[in-house]
Design a protein with these regions (language model features):
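Structural recognition of the beta-strand scaffold that forms the well-ordered cores
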Residues: 37-40, 74, 117-119, 129-133, ...
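A non-catalytic alpha/beta surface segment that caps or lines the substrate-entry region
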Residues: 47-120
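Metal-dependent peptidase/peptidase-like ectodomains
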Residues: 125, 177, 186-290
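Extracytoplasmic/secreted proteins, especially bacterial periplasmic and envelope-associated proteins
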Residues: 27, 31-34, 38, 52-64, ...
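His/Asp/Glu-rich mid-to-C-terminal helical/loop segments that flank catalytic regions of hydrolases
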Residues: 170, 174, 289-347
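Second-shell loop/turn segments in exported
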Residues: 20-26, 42-52, 101-107, 146-158, ...
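N-terminal hydrophobic or amphipathic helices/low-complexity stretches enriched
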Residues: 15-72, 120-121, 126, 339
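Alpha-helical metal-binding/catalytic segments enriched in His/Glu/Asp
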Residues: 116-118, 128-192, 322
Length: 347
C-alpha cells in the first residue's frame, strides 16, 4: 500500500489539473468605470489617431492586456495617408466636433497609427481562434479655441467598448479555454474603419482560422435588462451561439432589423468583408430611442465624457455576455469549426 500511495497521489493530481476551472467572477460596473475614467480623461486628449494622446492610450491598453495575462502583446503599426480634398458642403451642417474632426482629417497628411493586439493561448488548440475587439481612437481636440471644453473624450464611443474588452480578457485568461483568443484594440476607426482593415490585411494568424469575432462599440447607453440585438451577416452560424448564450444569462432576444443601418459603421464590417464571421451583440442596439438620444446629444462632441450618471448597467451585462460568448466559441465541444457566410445584412 505504501508503494501505491505515491502513484495514487500522482493520479489524483492529474485528475485535479484536468478539471475545468471554475467560472470567473462576473465583471462589475466599477471595473468598467475605472478603465473608462482613464481612457476618457483629458490627459489622453481625445485619443485622435496619430497623436500623442492616441500613443498614450495604445501603451495603456497594451499594459492592461499584459496584466490580464495575454501573451504576444504588440502594436501593429499601419500608415494612414490622407490626400487633402475639398470638404463636401454638407459638412457645414455637421455638429461642431465632427466638422472640426473632418477639417483635421483633411489637413493631416500621412501618419502612423497602431492597433494593440494580444493573445490568450488555448490549452487544446485546433487551428481555430476567436477575436474580441473594440476601437480605442476618438476625435481628439474637437471644439474651437473659444470653447471651455475642447476635448472629445469619447467615454461612450468607445472607451466603454475597450473597457469591456480588457475585462473580458482578464476573465478569459483564467478559464483555460481550448482555443486561442485574440484581443484587438483598433486605431483609426473614426477615419473609416482603417485599423480593422489593417488588421484584416496583415493579421497575426490566417483569417480562415478565425471562426468567431465579436466587436464592442458604444455599449454604455442602455440600462440593464435590455434584450440582446445582433448586428451580423445574414445567415451567420453564430446566431444560434449568441441566442443560447443570451438565454443562459436570462436575457431576451430582439430579432427585428431596427439597427441594421449601423452594420457598415463599425469595425466588424471591415472584417466581415474579408469573410470573417463577425458580430456585434448587446443591448445598446436594442434600445434605439436611447441610442438615438445619445447620438443627438453627446456623440462626437465634448459632452461624451464620463459622469456619475453615465449608464453602465447594460454595459456590464454586455461585457459578461461576451465572457460567455467567448467561453462557448473557444470550446471545441460547444462550437465545432465551420465556415463563414459572408452575406451582407442582419438577423
Amino acid at each position: 500500500m505504501k508503494r501505491l500511495l505515491p502513484l495514487l497521489l500522482l493520479l489524483l493530481a492529474g485528475c485535479a489539473t484536468s478539471r475545468p476551472p471554475p467560472p470567473p467572477p462576473p465583471i462589475a460596473e466599477a471595473e468598467l468605470r475605472t478603465t473608462i475614467a482613464v481612457l476618457a480623461s483629458d490627459g489622453f486628449e481625445g485619443r485622435m489617431a496619430g497623436t500623442p494622446g492616441s500613443d498614450k492610450a495604445a501603451a495603456y491598453i497594451a499594459e492592461r492586456f499584459r496584466a490580464a495575462g495575454a501573451q504576444d502583446v504588440s502594436l501593429q503599426a499601419f500608415k494612414v495617408d490622407r490626400t487633402p480634398t475639398s470638404l463636401p458642403a454638407v459638412s457645414a451642417k455637421l455638429p461642431a466636433g465632427q466638422r472640426l474632426f473632418m477639417e483635421e482629417m483633411n489637413k493631416r497628411g500621412a501618419f502612423t497609427a497602431h492597433n494593440v493586439v494580444g493573445r490568450v493561448r488555448g490549452r487544446a488548440p485546433d487551428g481555430r481562434a476567436i477575436v474580441v475587439m473594440a476601437h480605442y481612437d476618438h476625435l481628439g481636440i474637437c471644439a474651437p479655441e473659444t470653447t471651455a471644453d475642447r476635448i472629445c473624450n469619447g467615454a461612450v464611443d468607445n472607451a466603454s467598448g475597450v473597457a469591456a474588452v480588457i475585462a473580458v480578457a482578464e476573465r478569459v485568461a483564467t478559464m483555460g479555454l481550448d482555443r486561442d483568443v485574440w484581443f484587438v484594440a483598433t486605431d483609426a476607426e473614426e477615419w473609416g474603419l482603417l485599423g480593422a482593415k489593417a488588421f484584416a490585411a496583415s493579421p497575426p494568424l490566417p483569417l480562415g482560422q478565425i471562426i468567431a469575432g465579436f466587436n464592442l462599440d458604444t455599449i454604455a447607453v442602455a440600462p440593464k435588462g435590455m434584450p440582446v440585438a445582433m448586428l451580423a451577416a445574414k445567415g451567420t452560424p453564430l446566431e444560434s451561439l449568441v441566442r443560447a448564450a443570451a438565454a443562459s444569462m436570462g436575457r431576451t432576444w430582439d430579432g427585428d432589423d431596427e439597427a441594421a443601418g449601423f452594420l457598415q459603421r463599425q469595425d466588424g464590417w471591415a472584417l466581415a468583408q474579408r469573410g470573417m464571421p463577425m458580430i456585434m451583440a448587446g443591448g445598446s442596439f436594442s434600445d434605439l430611442k436611447r441610442l438615438n438620444a445619445f447620438l443627438a446629444a453627446a456623440y462626437h462632441s465634448p459632452a461624451d465624457e464620463l459622469r456619475s450618471d453615465t449608464e453602465l448597467g447594460g454595459a456590464v451585462e454586455d461585457a459578461n455576455l461576451h465572457v460567455e460568448l467567448v467561453r462557448r466559441a473557444a470550446s471545441r465541444t460547444l462550437l465545432p469549426s465551420f465556415g463563414a457566410v459572408p452575406q451582407v445584412g442582419r438577423r
